[in-house]
């Protein structure tokens, strides 16, 4: 039986609540350590490239002006490795005292399901575009204008940073970017947020849906982009249900890599052909395509769930 019924036991003999609190501590400490190490790497690269120390001290925002694409991607990879790989690995080995393969009830993947997962993830882009547009256009009441200004400024800064490491000058840079932006986060974030955090929440709350949605919210929030929180949370929920139903961490990993990968490919296509579809803009697609894509995604989720329900029933 592959389906995860009660959450995989990674408590290390502790109570479910204390285990969850330890996991939560690992997530936030890992996040700040990853940010710190990534920042140190950025500063070192900038100093090597001749950045004056007084300029960096007075205006840290100019840091990326002294970094090439390869260096920006390297610092991003450093952050991802520390936060998304080392954090869950240390928790599993030091606290849970288990190997990382404990996160899957099923060994290997089935090619038809891999193909369906990639197609389903692509079709989810059409549905998620509505959440992207709605989230991006949220406006707060006057008394929250300070928060709105802060969130908009942070969004603009992160957009500029994203542009820095998605401006590819050749195919080799695109491949490096694909690994750093799609493959590494796809693997690491699923190990951390679905494999460790979701299982820990599932064991504590005894409710799979609460575990999935709370994990998805933390996954969305930790990216520090309020105006992208809801679509990221929706993505996290999709990954969470794929994991719950299959008991196989590799299906959410494949879906996550596909989602990020589609965006990287679209950006590279835009730079090569000087045109590309805007996946964040619902008006970029005909209404029939939007509805069709959404229906295909819903059908995929239904069939994926039923596949593993039938597997469970046949084993009983």
Segments (PLM) and residue ranges:
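C-terminal membrane module of polytopic membrane proteins
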Residues: 7, 257-316
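Functionally important transmembrane alpha-helices
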Residues: 217-281
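Alpha-helical transmembrane segments in multi-pass membrane proteins
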Residues: 40-94, 111-122, 143-147
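Hydrophobic core of alpha-helical transmembrane segments in multi-pass integral membrane proteins
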Residues: 27-31, 84-89, 118-124, 288-308
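Alpha-helical transmembrane segments and their helix-start/interface "positive-inside/aromatic belt" motifs
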Residues: 9-32, 104-123, 246
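Juxtamembrane helix-loop-helix connectors linking adjacent transmembrane helices
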Residues: 53-57, 101-184
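Membrane-interface helix/loop boundary segments of multi-pass membrane proteins
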Residues: 188-214, 244-247
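Hydrophobic alpha-helical transmembrane segments
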Residues: 64-83, 155-184, 284-296
């Amino acid at each position: 039986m592959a389906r995860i019924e009660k959450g995989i036991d990674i408590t290390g003999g502790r109570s479910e609540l204390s285990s969850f609190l330890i996991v939560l501590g690992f997530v936030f400490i890992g996040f700040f350590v990853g940010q710190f190490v990534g920042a140190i790497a950025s500063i070192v690269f900038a100093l090597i490239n001749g950045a004056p120390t007084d300029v960096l001290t007075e205006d840290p925002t100019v840091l990326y002006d002294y970094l090439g694409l390869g260096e920006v991607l390297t610092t991003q990879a450093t952050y991802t490795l520390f936060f998304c790989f080392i954090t869950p690995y240390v928790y599993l080995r030091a606290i849970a005292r288990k190997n990382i393969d404990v996160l899957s009830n099923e060994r290997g993947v089935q090619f038809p399901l891999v193909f369906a997962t990639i197609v389903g993830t692509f079709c989810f882009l059409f549905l998620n575009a509505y959440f992207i547009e709605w989230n991006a256009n949220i406006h707060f009441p006057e008394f929250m204008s300070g928060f709105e200004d802060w969130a908009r400024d942070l969004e603009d800064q992160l957009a500029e940073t994203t542009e820095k490491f998605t401006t590819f000058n050749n195919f080799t840079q695109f491949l490096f970017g694909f690994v750093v932006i799609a493959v590494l986060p796809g693997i690491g974030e699923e190990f951390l947020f679905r494999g460790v955090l979701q299982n820990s929440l599932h064991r504590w709350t005894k409710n799979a849906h609460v575990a999935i949605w709370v994990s998805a919210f933390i996954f969305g929030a930790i990216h520090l982009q309020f105006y992208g929180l809801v679509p990221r949370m929706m993505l996290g929920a999709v990954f969470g249900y794929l994991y719950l139903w299959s008991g196989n961490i590799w299906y959410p990993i494949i879906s996550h890599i596909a989602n990020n990968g589609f965006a990287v490919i679209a950006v590279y296509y835009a730079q090569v052909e000087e045109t590309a579809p805007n996946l964040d803009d619902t008006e970029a697609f005909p209404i029939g395509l939007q509805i069709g894509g959404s229906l295909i995604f819903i059908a995929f989720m239904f069939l994926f769930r039923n596949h593993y329900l039938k597997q469970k029933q046949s084993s009983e």
